[in-house]
């Protein structure tokens, strides 16, 4: 449970997968350099199962967790989509309903 230092927020978490660590690092570096994300967490070793063009696929991927704000999310999604090697990359935006005030302040200050 968050204490009195938690607050409502306009922050969001963006989920994206990449085919390998090098691609994930490149994508993360792009959105960080453009100040569209405050932080990127890269989790290698994810296994994704999905149907693509009628066939069950299984891929080993890197799960990316990117932290940003509502006002930066569209630019981040466009940046990721334009540089991503997948035809249809995973781009999901999850609202952050509450968070630590100090962390959220840092997140906002880290963006352009």
From Swiss-Prot:
Compartments where located: Cytoplasm
Gene Ontology molecular functions: copper ion binding
Cofactor(s) of this protein: Cu cation
Keyword Protein transport: no
SUPFAM superfamilies: GlnB-like
Residues at which Cu cation binds: 16, 83-84
Major subcellular location class: cytoplasm
Cofactor binding mode and count: Binds 1 copper ion per subunit.
Role, per record: Involved in resistance toward heavy metals.
Subunit structure: Homotrimer.
Name the record gives this protein: Divalent-cation tolerance protein CutA
Native source organism of the sequence: Escherichia coli O81 (strain ED1a)
């Amino acid at each position: 449970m968050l204490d009195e230092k938690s607050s409502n927020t306009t922050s969001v978490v963006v989920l994206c997968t990449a085919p390998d660590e090098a691609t994930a690092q490149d994508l993360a570096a792009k959105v960080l350099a453009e100040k569209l994300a405050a932080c990127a967490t890269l989790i290698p070793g994810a296994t994704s199962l999905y149907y693509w063009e009628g066939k069950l696929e299984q891929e080993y991927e890197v799960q990316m967790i990117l932290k940003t704000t509502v006002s930066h999310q569209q630019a981040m999604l466009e940046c990721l989509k334009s540089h991503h090697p997948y035809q249809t990359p995973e781009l999901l935006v999850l609202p952050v309903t509450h968070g630590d005030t100090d962390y959220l302040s840092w997140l906002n200050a880290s963006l352009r």
